[in-house]
């Protein structure tokens, strides 16, 4: 995708070398935005092969409200293993915040159910927002949310989503995040009777780890290929009824996978 290659160039050309929590070191910039028209194909990176199974199962795991890696491991997904404790627990991370945000009065709020209800009943609302940044529970999370707030917008029968990502690993994380939130937008559009619109990806600290520079430069030498298509295998009424088998990716022809170390 041209948008992704432009992001890589922007960080390499304008970034500052900075230390970071992991000790790896980054090239970092602050503030950037990409836009993807979801009518023009499913925005899954073609300059390296992505593991769609991991993307889809992680999203389904979030939507279940789950915070234990057992479900992921049972489905061959290992991307959260480094942060889990000996029992597989991660604390009140994304799934907990999306489905059971703990309010000051002790009440839990299902933000996803409320969001879908509001899209159906009040599509012009400017409050179609889900937040994972629960200040009162940050210290109990194995990893504070990187993609921490997203908002939906309905116009002309189309549903668009904007994500704010406070911290973005350009090589490993961002390609997953693009595909994940594009998929989420398409799923919510499906169950609310809308068409997918745009996915807008807004960044805070967007960075390339020092040990990923070679891999990023390799991607910049590769031609962008046509985007794949994503369709659903059946009609689904509830966002919580989707299963991995419902997602069909067609015409995905990426360049070969590129390995990179995860900074924990």
Swiss-Prot record:
PROSITE patterns: THYMIDYLATE_SYNTHASE. It catalyses: dUMP + (6R)-5,10-methylene-5,6,7,8-tetrahydrofolate = 7,8-dihydrofolate + dTMP. One of its GO terms (biological process) is dTMP biosynthetic process. Pathway: Pyrimidine metabolism; dTTP biosynthesis. DUMP binds at residues 21, 126-127, 166-169, 177, 207-209. The keyword Transferase applies. Its EC number is 2.1.1.45. It is found in: Cytoplasm. It is an enzyme of class 2 (transferase). Homodimer. This is Thymidylate synthase 2. It comes from Bacillus amyloliquefaciens (Bacillus velezensis).
């Amino acid at each position: 995708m041209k948008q992704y290659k432009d992001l890589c160039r922007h960080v390499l050309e304008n970034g500052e070398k900075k230390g970071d929590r992991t000790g790896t070191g980054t090239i970092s910039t602050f503030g950037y935005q990409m836009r993807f028209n979801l009518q023009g194909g499913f925005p899954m990176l073609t300059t390296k092969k992505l593991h769609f199974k991991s993307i889809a199962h992680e999203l389904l795991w979030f939507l279940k409200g789950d915070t234990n890696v057992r479900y992921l491991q049972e489905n061959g997904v290992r991307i959260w293993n480094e942060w889990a404790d000996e029992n597989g627990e991660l604390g009140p991370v994304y799934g907990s915040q999306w489905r059971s945000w703990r309010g000051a009065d002790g009440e839990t709020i299902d933000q996803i159910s409320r969001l879908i209800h509001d899209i159906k009943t009040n599509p012009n609302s400017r409050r179609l927002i889900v937040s994972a940044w629960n200040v009162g529970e940050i210290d109990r999370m194995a990893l504070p949310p990187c993609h921490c707030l997203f908002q939906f917008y309905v116009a002309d029968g189309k549903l668009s989503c904007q994500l704010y990502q406070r911290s973005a690993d350009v090589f490993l994380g961002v390609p997953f995040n693009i595909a994940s939130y594009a998929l989420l937008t398409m799923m919510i559009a499906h169950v609310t009777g809308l068409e997918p619109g745009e996915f807008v990806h807004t960044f805070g600290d967007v960075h390339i780890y020092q040990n990923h520079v070679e891999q990023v430069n390799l991607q910049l030498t590769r031609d962008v290929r046509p985007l794949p298509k994503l369709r659903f295998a059946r009609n689904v009424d509830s966002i919580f009824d989707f299963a991995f088998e419902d997602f069909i990716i067609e015409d995905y022809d990426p360049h070969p996978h590129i390995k990179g170390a995860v900074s924990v």
